Swiss-Prot record:
This is Ubiquinone biosynthesis O-methyltransferase. It comes from Chromobacterium violaceum (strain ATCC 12472 / DSM 30191 / JCM 1249 / CCUG 213 / NBRC 12614 / NCIMB 9131 / NCTC 9757 / MK). The gene is ubiG. Keywords: Methyltransferase, S-adenosyl-L-methionine, Transferase, Ubiquinone biosynthesis. Pathway: Cofactor biosynthesis; ubiquinone biosynthesis. S-adenosyl-L-methionine binds at residues 36, 55, 76, 120. The keyword Methyltransferase applies. Transmembrane segments: none annotated.
């Protein structure tokens, strides 16, 4: 069975034209991107490295990594989002190899091809996140880095990420997230371990609604980032 939720694909396809509008539904992604980029670069030193961005969407993270000197491949199954990413790459003059392919299929085609793999804000949108984690591990070279970011599953995450962000503050469209698909760090850590990835860093990501600034912290109750490394 394909590890694709067509409703999720359709959801992001309808918003595809807004990916690079920093005042749109994608504003939070633009705001957290510098934080994500620094977290990735601090661990993997991506300049000159081959990096794969899984679930790249409109290319926000992919372009920023390319601007840091990485050789970036971005993959997504939402064709409209991918077309936006390709056009923006051409307009920006930032070369990125974008492909419409499932991560599991790419893993079968290109095992061990990348120095680092990123899978950010994507696991909570697929039926089988463990399949994605395994594929990411297969795609990275021995000793390479795999980065994940997703949402914890608890009452606080539900109140802030679903009720607060989607229904009170209107930061995200209603229905963006399905709470049952949120992943506890322990669950994601277990998936990573079973895939041959060792946990290196676990960090929370917080948002101050007054200053409108995101920062890394020790609170993983809602959003969190995980840096893992494949054994040599």
């Amino acid at each position: 069975m394909s590890n694709v939720d067509e409703l999720e694909i359709d959801k992001f396809s309808q918003l595809a034209h807004k990916w690079w509008d920093k005042d749109s539904e994608f504003k939070p992604l633009h705001e957290i991107n510098p934080l994500r980029l620094d977290f990735i670069d601090r661990h993997a030193s991506i300049a000159g490295k081959k990096v794969l961005d899984v679930g790249c969407g409109g290319g926000i993270l992919a372009e920023s990594m390319a601007l840091r000197g990485a050789q970036v491949t971005g993959i997504d199954l939402a064709k409209k989002s991918l077309k936006v990413a390709q056009l923006h790459s051409l307009e920006s003059g930032v070369p990125i190899d974008y492909r419409c392919v499932a991560v599991e299929d790419l893993a079968a085609e290109m095992p061990g091809a990348f120095d680092a793999v990123t899978c950010m804000e994507m696991l909570e949108h697929v039926p089988d996140p463990e399949s994605v984690v395994r594929a990411c591990s297969t795609l990275v070279k021995p000793g390479g880095w795999v980065f994940f970011s997703t949402l914890n599953r608890n009452a606080k995450a539900y109140l802030l990420a679903v009720v607060g962000a989607e229904y009170v503050l209107n930061m995200l469209p209603r229905g963006t997230h399905e709470y049952a698909r949120f992943l506890k760090p322990s669950e994601l850590g277990r998936m990573a371990r079973h895939a041959g990835l060792g946990l290196q860093t676990l960090s929370g990501m917080g948002y101050n609604p007054v200053t409108r600034i995101y920062s890394l912290n020790d609170d993983t109750a809602v959003n969190y980032l995980m840096a893992t490394r494949r054994a040599d």
